[in-house]
């Protein structure tokens, strides 16, 4: 836990994990794991540095760069780089903390970390972004490596930025190695990587539908937030599987379907083009079957929905919006974004699950539901280490297996450690938290990172 009063995002992530551990039988059966939680909540290393670069007018600009190397008990630090003006140590510690247990749920050998800078790529020229990425990597390259720390993309860091950073690393270190994931296919990247988080989210929720007896996606109405990679590819996969996508959004507002047909593949392709040009959805020329709601999130405007998938950013579903989704008939909520729901919203969903039993909403946390992205990053690392490339079908099949295992790992762990009434769906948030934590805690114990009294 933080020793500072100014890390609200990290405190929220810690409290969410600690609450589920405390309200299970884990600490009763294994009281020594309290020590593990105390140790695991402090990063192994925090790297903070200045990034000095030159804008197109020849002016000196400076930003704050970070890398939080949180836990390496299961493998090299693994987690994205975020470029956004909101980036600070609290946000990166929250993301890195979540990443530890998310990576554990994939079953792959990856530790947890996160990094980035308070640089805003919006409105910057290609040359400015290149100069920033090179300046950022001039320091970061000293602290990363294929067997040490393997960053990836995140908000503000796509294929272009990964390319600039990889080139800067290669020149500075004089090595060509799998030090970053999300690379171009011709220089070490993996097929399915851009689609992985969205596809994996849909595969995960498919197991929720099947286990609960709700059937397939056919005919289900799905509300999505966000309009980046996660939302785009989740929407395309949902449509492929027969669902109706009723919303997308960005920081400027929400795009909501007005009729029964929903958002089409053509609409999503148009959104992709807009986002590729780094523009807002306000520039989307929507037809009569869609409406634009300025400054709004979609949850209270979508009408009847069966499934809600927050895919934009943290804390994007409030208590009031959670209650609104329940009133709209929503039965499944899964986070495509990290910590997409506030603690109060999660409480609404979990209380409903306990009270309504088989008729309740079923909530899945981001560390399980959106682990597909980092899973395929891990598969990219495996391909890099073997100097080979798998086919799209091979990667997709491995992704499906990872999401299936993440679902059943959380489900079965909840059955062991969380008491449930007859007919009550298991708590996926508790089960996923416990499963990820126990795996990491045991590895830390075996390696001497913590110990119990004899």
From Swiss-Prot:
Protein name: NADP-specific glutamate dehydrogenase
Family: Belongs to the Glu/Leu/Phe/Val dehydrogenases family.
Documented EC number(s): 1.4.1.4
N-acetylserine, modified sites: 2
Gene that produces this protein: GDH
Superkingdom, taxonomy of origin: Eukaryota
InterPro entries (UniProt xref): Aminoacid_DH-like_N_sf (IPR046346), Glu/Leu/Phe/Val/Trp_DH (IPR006095), Glu/Leu/Phe/Val/Trp_DH_C (IPR006096), Glu/Leu/Phe/Val/Trp_DH_dimer (IPR006097), Glu/Leu/Phe/Val_DH_AS (IPR033524), Glu_DH (IPR014362), Glu_Leu_Phe_Val_DH (IPR050724), NAD(P)-bd_dom_sf (IPR036291)
Catalytic residues (UniProt): 114
Keywords of the record: Acetylation, NADP, Oxidoreductase
One Pfam match: ELFV_dehydrog
GO molecular function: glutamate dehydrogenase (NADP+) activity
Entry GO terms, CC: cytosol
GO biological process: glutamate biosynthetic process
Quaternary organization: Homohexamer.
Known catalytic reactions: L-glutamate + NADP(+) + H2O = 2-oxoglutarate + NH4(+) + NADPH + H(+)
